[in-house]
From Swiss-Prot:
NCBIfam families: gid_trmFO, PRK05335.1. It is found in: Cytoplasm. InterPro entries: FAD/NAD-bd_sf, MnmG-rel, MnmG-rel_CS, MnmG_N, TrmFO. Catalyzes the folate-dependent formation of 5-methyl-uridine at position 54 (M-5-U54) in all tRNAs. This is Methylenetetrahydrofolate--tRNA-(uracil-5-)-methyltransferase TrmFO.
């Protein structure tokens, strides 16, 4: 592929990081950003890497998975992290930034780089003859979204309005749940949390009275599109959930079940199912429980489910308008397209969730786009690192049930040997191993 530059489309967190990484490797970049020509409902300025919702890049401690990811990115020369550190504001253990100062600094560092040419224009076609990183965000313009949709054979680039909570399997009380698939079809693939009639009535009462998170103004018209939040379903009638995600039919108690039940009934009054969410089996999601409750309310209400009294939520349910790819089928672990090899994708459209995760994906995509340009082999970061585990998760998850994911210790490769029971000590050990493995990886 003969060319003299690399395209980057989109100057959000992922695109800005990708462009900077490419330019730092001595390769000219054409960075396309449509803001300035065409606005979006969310953005207030034309600056790069504008933080639309929150000014927080979340926890900074290494015992927090996103803190580990940020430390890895610092060591990889992230322009996003450099700008965040320079514009940080007091926020306890979190890294929060002056919103305007942060985006202005990213804009200056990227736009003033001698090898980056900024082009204020909307791209409506996918380049076929130039290495290109596409990082156009969750609200990709309709024209370009249509081209990506076609590239994916009409599949895998679709709106996402809801996600169910995901739980650390080690925090589920296994004495209160049982393994079974409905009607015993196939393998016993679900953990089932049975409820008596009274438990269900109490749960329903708590759910319909729980406080929902407010929607951003630009999301309101999309609220009910393509999904049914569990709390909305519950408000339609006391038995509505019993014909939906809490349907007990075909999920009889096992013979050795000793927990509470209504009389001699062989089938629970209601059942909440949990499905394995990652290949390692360390994460489970609550099936059909997409929600827009406030996070504190999710914890309060969903911990009423038998077996989840002490559950740790690695991701709470969320609802907002988004578009993302079927990355397990469409992307390599390097963020390179399987269908059109000159293309890389980065940011929320790949199925990573969160500011830091978006920037991290742009960092990896930028590094690999530069390596392809130089005819060098692409790199896959170790699965023991946060940045590597995120790339692995979105490209190896079950495609049929794939949903956006933020970084968490549940997706990072387990430590070898006996499990460390103290959570803080375990996370410290995972972080220590991650940074050691990253250093070794960078010296090879």
């Amino acid at each position: 592929m003969s060319q003299s530059y690399i395209n980057v489309i989109g100057a959000g967190l992922a695109g800005s990081e990708a462009a900077y990484q490419i330019a730092e490797r001595g390769i000219p970049v054409k960075l396309y950003e449509m803001r300035g020509v065409k606005s979006t409902p969310q953005h207030k300025t034309d600056n790069f890497a504008e933080l639309v919702c929150s000014n927080s890049l979340r926890g900074d401690a290494l015992t927090n998975a996103v803190g580990l990811l940020k430390e890895e990115m610092r060591r990889l020369g992230s322009v996003i992290l450099e700008s965040a550190e320079a514009t940080r504001v007091p926020a306890g253990g979190a890294l929060a930034v002056d919103r305007d100062g942060f985006s202005q600094m990213v804009t200056e560092k990227v736009a003033n780089h001698p090898l980056i040419e900024v082009v204020r224009d909307e791209i409506t076609e996918l380049p076929t003859d130039v290495i290109t990183v596409i990082a156009t965000g969750p609200l990709t313009s309709d024209a370009l979204a249509e081209k990506i949709h076609a590239l994916n054979d009409g599949d895998g680039f679709y709106f996402y309005d809801a996600a169910a909570p995901i739980i650390d399997v080690n925090t589920i009380d296994m004495s209160k749940v049982y393994l079974k698939s409905r009607y015993d079809k196939g393998e016993a693939a679900y953990l089932n949390a049975p409820m008596t009639k009274q438990e269900f009535m109490d749960f329903h009462e708590a759910l319909v009275n729980a406080e929902e998170a407010p929607l951003n103004s630009f999301e309101k018209e999309k609220y009910f599109e393509g999904c049914m939040p569990i709390e909305v379903m519950a408000k339609r009638g006391i038995k509505t959930m019993l014909y939906g995600p809490m349907k007990p039919v075909g999920l009889e108690y096992p013979d050795d079940y000793t927990g509470p039940r209504d009389g001699e009934f062989k089938t629970p009054y209601a059942v909440v199912q949990l499905r394995q969410d990652n290949a390692a089996g360390s994460l489970y999601n609550i099936v059909g429980f997409q929600t827009h409750l406030k996070w504190g309310e999710q914890k309060r209400v969903f911990q009423m489910i038998p077996g989840l009294e002490n559950a740790e939520f690695v991701r709470y349910g969320v609802m907002h308008r988004n578009s993302y790819m079927d990355s397990p089928n469409l992307l390599e672990q390097t963020y390179r397209s399987k269908k059109q090899p000159n293309l890389f994708f980065a940011g929320q459209m790949t199925g990573v969730e969160g500011y830091v995760e978006s920037a991290a994906s742009g960092l990896v995509a930028g590094i690999n786009a530069a390596r392809l340009f130089k005819e060098e082999s692409e790199v896959i970061f170790p699965e023991t690192t946060a940045i590597g585990s995120l790339a692995h998760y979105i490209t190896h998850a079950d495609s049929k049930h794939f949903q956006p994911m933020n970084v968490n210790f549940g997706i990072i490769k387990e430590l070898e040997g006996e499990r460390i029971r103290d959570k803080k000590a375990r996370y410290e050990k995972i972080a220590e191993r991650a940074l050691a493995d990253l250093e070794e990886f960078l010296t090879v």
